[in-house]
Amino acid sequence: MTENIHKHRILILDFGSQYTQLVARRVRELGVYCELWAWDVTEAQIREFNPSGIILSGGPESTTEENSPRAPQYVFEAGVPVFGVCYGMQTMAMQLGGHVEGSNEREFGYAQVEVVNDSALVRGIEDSLTADGKPLLDVWMSHGDKVTAIPSDFVTVASTDNCPFAIMANEEKRFYGVQFHPEVTHTRQGMRMLERFVRDICQCEALWTPAKIIDDAVERIRQQVGDDKVILGLSGGVDSSVTAMLLHRAIGKNLTCVFVDNGLLRLNEAQQVMDMFGDHFGLNIVHVEGEQRFLDALKGENDPEAKRKIIGRVFVEVFDEEALKLDDVKWLAQGTIYPDVIESAASATGKAHVIKSHHNVGGLPKEMKMGLVEPLRELFKDEVRKIGLELGLPYDMLYRHPFPGPGLGVRVLGEVKKEYCDLLRRADAIFIEELHKADLYNKVSQAFTVFLPVRSVGVMGDGRKYDWVVSLRAVETIDFMTAHWAHLPYDFLGRVSNRIINEVNGISRVVYDISGKPPATIEWE
């Protein structure tokens, strides 16, 4: 038996903050398993989960409103440490007898909090000292309401000029509340505070490490599928690749991967996938040449949403046909990751935890009665990448920029044709190659080329030619919800443009997209 890596676990109750998933990722980075649940859980669910500690997240609502969310009362009766963050602190204060008021002054941004009383949460943690030797912490505030009276059995640990209770604590019960966000990097000692809570106060061991996660996943796969055969749609993306490697380690030749080349992949990508997973790692792969079938289905279609649906539908058809050719396959594997699971479980009060399977592959044929294997469903994307490295996948592949599921189908604007895809593949490869050469690839979050179905006049030698236009796109973002266009050097852009126009016959003009998100989206379609 492998070690029980879920033995120590933190429960995070989500009150709707944009940072809640970040809290969970930080706890995982500390080597401790945690789960994110909607705030409206029942006592029975908490008892069954049996957490070592509970974190109450921030949230956009006001505790002063009558129907705003509250933590289940059992949270404060379970006998485990509780850590309230921002809204979580406010609801803790209100529920335990303190008082919260709306404030005219919204506190948003950097603040310095002064530690005025000793607490296990911040003992020995400081950014600087006041003139009389009191610890100061640089933190990130984002709140309107504030606690104006703490419960009678709590003490004030830290305050700012306009936030008298920036940290409150009941050391005996191990209840702590902070009015700032320890999970964001702007709170410089935030990770140390979370570590203090999770590792010291809750006494969780760091069992959640890539090597142990792999051992646990392999054992669970073997227990689930036994000697049965499993099929997986391998795309060459991060999630399906790591899923393939885990399954291969667990069940070897009982895994069959189906790789569908839809003609909408990057330059030489199909060959790279076959070389790496087939030749190098020795996986059992069925390679389906599907380019013509996808292009035929897309013929004459200009609408982006319709193109996505067609590509998805044809993929499912092809995958199903291949699955039916295989004898006795009992299980379908998918690269579902934890954010997919959270998304599908979004709280509808009372039905918070009906977690639907998040189908990447779409509907399977009625005649195929298959179970579902999802070895990554507990993991965040950054954890999936770390596991991939541990399993021997190359860094460049795991940390490559995101590529849309429909591939070039949504980077060729309007109707998709083979000619357009071939031109775009070559132009995009030049852009990416130059980014690597200039050491800029890892400085931008995503970079790609878009094919515009418009002809523009160009000059070649003594002649004029009407050829196609491509746009380069590069953005910087933390979460892909908002993004800035990347200010790439002019001489770099000039070099890329010259190479594309000179080396890709059929392109006469290169433009650079300087739109942010919002108002534009990152992808053009």
From Swiss-Prot:
Gene Ontology molecular function terms on file: ATP binding; GMP synthase activity
Domain Glutamine amidotransferase type-1: 9-207
Pathway: Purine metabolism; GMP biosynthesis; GMP from XMP (L-Gln route): step 1/1
SUPFAM superfamilies: Adenine nucleotide alpha hydrolases-like, Class I glutamine amidotransferase-like, GMP synthetase C-terminal dimerisation domain
Keywords linked to the UniProt accession: ATP-binding, Glutamine amidotransferase, GMP biosynthesis, Ligase, Nucleotide-binding, Purine biosynthesis
HAMAP family named in the record: GMP_synthase
Assembly behavior: Homodimer.
Residues annotated as domain GMPS ATP-PPase: 208-400
One Pfam family, short name: GATase
GO cellular component terms, A-Z: cytosol
Active site (catalytic residues): C86 (nucleophile), H181, E183
Reaction catalyzed: XMP + L-glutamine + ATP + H2O = GMP + L-glutamate + AMP + diphosphate + 2 H(+)
Protein residues bound to ATP: S235, G236, G237, V238, D239, S240, S241
E.C. no: 6.3.5.2
PROSITE patterns listed in its UniProt record: GATASE_TYPE_1, GMPS_ATP_PPASE
Function: Catalyzes the synthesis of GMP from XMP.
Organism expressing this protein natively: Klebsiella pneumoniae (strain 342)
Name of protein: GMP synthase [glutamine-hydrolyzing]
